[in-house]
Amino acid sequence: MTIKLIVGLANPGNKYLLTRHNVGSWYVNQLANNYHVSLINKSSFLGYTGYLNIGKRRIFLLIPTIFMNYNGQAVAAIAKFYNIMPEEILIAHDELNFLPGYARFKYSGGHGGHNGLKDVIYRLGDNNNFYRLRIGIGHPGDKNKVIKFVLDTPLDTEQQLIQHAINESVLCTSLMFQQNIAYAIHQLHTILK
């Protein structure tokens, strides 16, 4: 199976642009920049969209412009329009259980308390069989501080580590286009130990 849609989960607007919760959108923006693709706000897909032409394949990009807890609406809208199956989707999102500088590809699984993922699973018909790119942001150490933590900007040192993980993830995504998903997963997991 090949990836046909890459989504960076996000909250909308400048207020949230640089927050930890939006690191998935940082990844999609970096990927678009590397391939010289402009993302355009498309209201029918509830987000910024564009596509990459890789050989004979077209891979769609999406950054939702609705709040994180409803990002699944945007994913479902574009997937339905282009007839993209859940297993052909890669969702990039922030991961509290990983330290900054760490990222991992994963296939399937639960939402782990991430409301954006929870909505994606729900909107895809309670189907969790899609790929994820989990980008580490760290944990505040107290579950009562999580909401404020994810909606804050990372410290400068954390930002550098997160950006490094995103850069490596984008390189490995390019390997996925050239080789296959298994190869990209192996490379990313080898680079970011």
Curated annotation (Swiss-Prot):
Reaction catalysis annotation: an N-acyl-L-alpha-aminoacyl-tRNA + H2O = an N-acyl-L-amino acid + a tRNA + H(+)
Active site residues according to the UniProt entry: 21 (proton acceptor)
GO cellular component, one term: cytoplasm
GO MF annotation terms: peptidyl-tRNA hydrolase activity; tRNA binding
Subunit description: Monomer.
UniProt function note: Hydrolyzes ribosome-free peptidyl-tRNAs (with 1 or more amino acids incorporated), which drop off the ribosome during protein synthesis, or as a result of ribosome stalling.
Protein name per the record: Peptidyl-tRNA hydrolase
Gene name of the encoded protein: pth
